């Protein structure tokens, strides 16, 4: 309703005027197709940021609030989320994971990959049309059921797989996500992405004053 929309607007406005949007890069140093990371402590905690890479994340253990576009959503153990390219977001973990001399550990597997991770030529093929369709959906942020057996298997094995198997597994799971997996869209249809680097730079200059 209108009250909730107004509340979200002012919360997001406060985020923009108190935090700089940081452009991050997750490009693999070894020329791999994408990055797989296993985290035991929160990364980019409370950092309002964006990156060209899509972010595909499984939170086995960890709770807090996800800010993405114009959406604010609690995250919890088991959540699986796909964030599209250049979508502003940040993960605000609960104090249990960031405060004190011995904060609790998280258990997270996260992948970062460019839209062209399997080459621009492959993406142009008719057989890869599912990727382009999924990339459009991911611009709204997608949250999947944590009890999906296929997604759970993917996240539990991807870090230990060979380089070739990683690549084929990611393509297969993205096809599944586009065609079969049930997802909740997080960002509202009316949200406009600041999709030009200059827009972010101008926003950050405004914040500096």
Regions found by a protein language model. Give the residues of each.
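N-terminal regulatory/effector-sensing and dimerization cores
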Residues: 33-133
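Short, charged, low-hydrophobicity "junction" segments
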Residues: 6-8, 53-67, 144, 148-153
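Helix-loop "lid/cap" segments that line or gate small-molecule binding pockets
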Residues: 114-118, 139, 175
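Aromatic/histidine-rich interaction motifs
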Residues: 124-153
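Short, Lys/Arg-enriched N-terminal segments with co-localized hydrophobic residues
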Residues: 1-18
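Short, Lys/Arg-enriched, Trp-marked, Pro/Gly-tolerant hinge/linker segments that flank
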Residues: 142-146, 159-209
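A general structural signal for short secondary-structure boundary/capping elements
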Residues: 103, 127-130, 153-161, 176-181
């Amino acid at each position: 309703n209108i009250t909730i929309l107004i509340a979200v607007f002012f919360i997001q406005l406060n985020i923009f005027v108190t935090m700089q949007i940081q452009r991050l890069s997750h490009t693999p140093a070894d020329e791999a197709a994408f990055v797989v990371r296993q985290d035991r402590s929160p990364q980019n905690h409370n950092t309002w940021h964006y990156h060209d890479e899509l972010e595909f994340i499984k939170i086995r253990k960890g709770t807090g609030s996800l800010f993405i576009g114009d959406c604010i959503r609690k995250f919890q153990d088991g959540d699986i989320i796909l964030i599209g390219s250049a979508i502003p977001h940040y993960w605000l973990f609960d104090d249990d994971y960031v405060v004190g001399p011995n904060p609790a550990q998280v258990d997270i597997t996260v992948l970062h990959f460019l839209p062209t991770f399997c080459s621009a030529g492959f993406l142009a093929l008719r057989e890869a049309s599912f990727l382009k369709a999924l990339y459009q959906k991911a611009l709204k942020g997608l949250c999947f059921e944590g009890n999906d057996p296929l997604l759970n298997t993917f996240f539990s094995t991807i870090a230990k797989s060979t380089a070739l198997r990683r690549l084929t597994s990611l393509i297969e799971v993205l096809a599944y996500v586009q065609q079969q997996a049930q997802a909740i869209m997080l960002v509202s249809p009316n949200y406009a992405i600041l999709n030009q680097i200059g827009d972010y730079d101008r926003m950050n200059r405004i914040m500096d004053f």
